């Protein structure tokens, strides 16, 4: 299948399922099953419930998708560590 045939949609992760699968609610209100792309797994990009993502879907099966981008928001920065106490 050529890359031009894929449909790109945006959505929000509703639920994190076992085996690195996700349930995503698209902007048009439809819920689909999705998995993280190999590049996201390779770079250990963590996807949590509530994250805004972009996914690719095949026009032949609109119930499954591949997450290929996690959008940054105000809460996705690195966790702040408490200050170190020196003696």
Curated annotation (Swiss-Prot):
Residues 1-72 form the S1-like domain. The keyword Magnesium does not apply. Pfam families: eIF-1a. It is found in: Cytoplasm. One of its GO terms (cellular component) is cytosol. It comes from the Bacteria. SMART domains: S1. The keyword rRNA-binding applies. Gene3D superfamilies: Nucleic acid-binding proteins (2.40.50.140). Component of the 30S ribosomal translation pre-initiation complex which assembles on the 30S ribosome in the order IF-2 and IF-3, IF-1 and N-formylmethionyl-tRNA(fMet); mRNA recruitment can occur at any time during PIC assembly. HAMAP family: IF_1. PANTHER family: TRANSLATION INITIATION FACTOR IF-1, CHLOROPLASTIC. This is Translation initiation factor IF-1 1. It comes from Bordetella pertussis (strain Tohama I / ATCC BAA-589 / NCTC 13251). The lineage of its organism: Bacteria, Pseudomonadati, Pseudomonadota, Betaproteobacteria, Burkholderiales. The gene is infA1.
């Amino acid at each position: 299948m050529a890359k031009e045939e894929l449909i790109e949609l945006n959505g929000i992760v509703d639920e994190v399922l076992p085996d690195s699968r996700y349930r995503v609610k698209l902007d048009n209100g439809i819920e689909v099953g999705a998995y993280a792309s190999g590049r996201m797994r390779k770079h250990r990009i963590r996807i949590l419930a509530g994250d805004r993502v972009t996914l690719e879907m095949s026009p032949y099966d609109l119930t499954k998708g591949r997450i290929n981008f996690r959008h940054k928001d105000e809460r996705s920065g690195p966790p702040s560590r408490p200050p170190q106490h020196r003696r």
